[in-house]
Amino acid sequence: MEYKTSKGVTFAYSPLIDVPHGFSTRLGGVSEAAHTSALNLAFDKGDGRETVLKNLALFAAAVGVDEKSIISAPQIHSSTVRRVSAADAGRGYFKECGFACDGYITTERGVTLGVKTADCVPILMCAKRGSESRAVCALHAGWRGTSARIVEAALGELFALGFAPSDIYAAIGPSIGSCCY
């Protein structure tokens, strides 16, 4: 994992994953509430809608994606992994989501998968076979989802799409450590 600051926003990323991505930090946004620091990307943490959407635009620009392509469903601490498409772009931020899950998978370019974590573990997987066949998977892995085998569920989806274990790269983002318990 490496850290980068782009357009005033600091984020972590993995050089192993060759799609635009980032694991946000709290650095670089416009939030003013003390408990959110500056880059709050959640509607339920005390910032107004416009502040969260401005932070989203800043983060998206920093990592090189269109903020309207981001999907972010309510998370339920499960092992549910949902396949999503361009029709789902913007769900959770710009239109009602209509579903809840803790993981997404897509084979379509221009779809950005967003999970929110605090103590839980963000996991990003990219599967690639040849120059055209690609899938991306993002997971919110808390202890409940991990116990329910969310990573195994995601790998099962990737295998069902025809990818082999050697086609898949994964990055584990920043999360809470045992020192905090």
Positions of predicted regions on the chain:
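Active-site microenvironment for binding and transforming phosphate-containing groups
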Residues: 1-181
